[in-house]
């Protein structure tokens, strides 16, 4: 039986898709529909070369998925015919889902219930699931939750110091994100170190436009920087990360900002975009560090925050840390950021290998610290699509 899986990731205004062989990891098709719901809605994909097409003004997730089926897959009927399952990335599963699940009515309800914590993403996931059912009526759908990996966190890590009934009655707690990526990196480190996953102790830095750190002890998440939502934690592309909560009251009461304006500011106008007042693109920050004040300011704050988190998470390791790992678009490609962060952790006996660090980009992987470094640091390319495909194949019985 074929182990080809269609992997879908429906964002608020995007649809990322791939056809992945769950057995070999080979990607037979990859693509991205973006600007959904807007006049410039378009799709880019790779299948026997690179392609691009306009989807039509206002095209949304349903139209994008239909285009993928009726135009792209129609050009490769054998690819569509060999699909065995569909795996959906789900941003938030609340406390209900500790692992991936075959999608049933109960699972759909759980995704809907968790939408209160991910109001932009979970509703889009539900649209994608329904569209997939229509276009692929014979295939089983599997939900793979970003939050599931973090359900092993102890109470001391996931509770906020708020009235306890807010957790008991309303589920207000730390959930974390990027769990699929953190899980993949944990497995990769186990392979690299030739030890069981259950013995791996790492601090993984998933750095992209969204970013999070995860403390992983004995192969399980014990703490992570994102919280109830993806807004908490590190400085990100447009998200503020950690701030004094009273800033919200000051913005509202003293400066006259509406709740909607504050929400928009913290999620879409802060982070690197806010600090530079120019762009959320980390490449601008890196390229202009030391030359432009706004770039220098943003990079210093970004690296300081990240180094603080990494240092703090050593408290969860109980005396043994196998590695500090970097992944995600920034983590895999920004040598200067990795070096700045690791240099701030010199108290742990970490020594960066400058040459190895420079080589580890654009798909290059490996250890970026010297042989004398007490704790190794590694760059590892993440592959969330493969984890989703593997779980979908397993649960669908492929």
Curated annotation (Swiss-Prot):
<dbReference type="InterPro" id="IPR023865">
    <property type="entry name" value="Aliphatic_acid_kinase_CS"/>
</dbReference>
<feature type="binding site">
    <location>
        <begin position="206"/>
        <end position="210"/>
    </location>
    <ligand>
        <name>ATP</name>
    </ligand>
</feature>
<keyword id="KW-0460">Magnesium</keyword>
<feature type="binding site">
    <location>
        <begin position="329"/>
        <end position="333"/>
    </location>
    <ligand>
        <name>ATP</name>
    </ligand>
</feature>
<feature type="binding site">
    <location>
        <position position="9"/>
    </location>
    <ligand>
        <name>Mg(2+)</name>
    </ligand>
</feature>
<dbReference type="GO" id="GO:0005524">
    <property type="term" value="F:ATP binding"/>
</dbReference>
<keyword id="KW-0067">ATP-binding</keyword>
<dbReference type="Pfam" id="PF00871">
    <property type="entry name" value="Acetate_kinase"/>
</dbReference>
<comment type="pathway">
    <text>Metabolic intermediate biosynthesis; acetyl-CoA biosynthesis; acetyl-CoA from acetate: step 1/2.</text>
</comment>
<dbReference type="GO" id="GO:0006083">
    <property type="term" value="P:acetate metabolic process"/>
</dbReference>
<feature type="binding site">
    <location>
        <position position="384"/>
    </location>
    <ligand>
        <name>Mg(2+)</name>
    </ligand>
</feature>
<comment type="subunit">
    <text>Homodimer.</text>
</comment>
<keyword id="KW-0808">Transferase</keyword>
<dbReference type="GO" id="GO:0006085">
    <property type="term" value="P:acetyl-CoA biosynthetic process"/>
</dbReference>
<keyword id="KW-0418">Kinase</keyword>
<comment type="similarity">
    <text>Belongs to the acetokinase family.</text>
</comment>
<comment type="function">
    <text>Catalyzes the formation of acetyl phosphate from acetate and ATP. Can also catalyze the reverse reaction.</text>
</comment>
<keyword id="KW-0479">Metal-binding</keyword>
<protein>
    <recommendedName>
        <fullName>Acetate kinase</fullName>
        <ecNumber>2.7.2.1</ecNumber>
    </recommendedName>
</protein>
<feature type="binding site">
    <location>
        <position position="89"/>
    </location>
    <ligand>
        <name>substrate</name>
    </ligand>
</feature>
<feature type="binding site">
    <location>
        <begin position="281"/>
        <end position="283"/>
    </location>
    <ligand>
        <name>ATP</name>
    </ligand>
</feature>
<keyword id="KW-0963">Cytoplasm</keyword>
<dbReference type="InterPro" id="IPR043129">
    <property type="entry name" value="ATPase_NBD"/>
</dbReference>
<dbReference type="GO" id="GO:0000287">
    <property type="term" value="F:magnesium ion binding"/>
</dbReference>
<dbReference type="GO" id="GO:0008776">
    <property type="term" value="F:acetate kinase activity"/>
</dbReference>
<dbReference type="InterPro" id="IPR004372">
    <property type="entry name" value="Ac/propionate_kinase"/>
</dbReference>
<dbReference type="InterPro" id="IPR000890">
    <property type="entry name" value="Aliphatic_acid_kin_short-chain"/>
</dbReference>
<feature type="binding site">
    <location>
        <position position="16"/>
    </location>
    <ligand>
        <name>ATP</name>
    </ligand>
</feature>
<keyword id="KW-0547">Nucleotide-binding</keyword>
<feature type="site" description="Transition state stabilizer">
    <location>
        <position position="178"/>
    </location>
</feature>
<feature type="active site" description="Proton donor/acceptor">
    <location>
        <position position="146"/>
    </location>
</feature>
<dbReference type="GO" id="GO:0005829">
    <property type="term" value="C:cytosol"/>
</dbReference>
<feature type="site" description="Transition state stabilizer">
    <location>
        <position position="239"/>
    </location>
</feature>
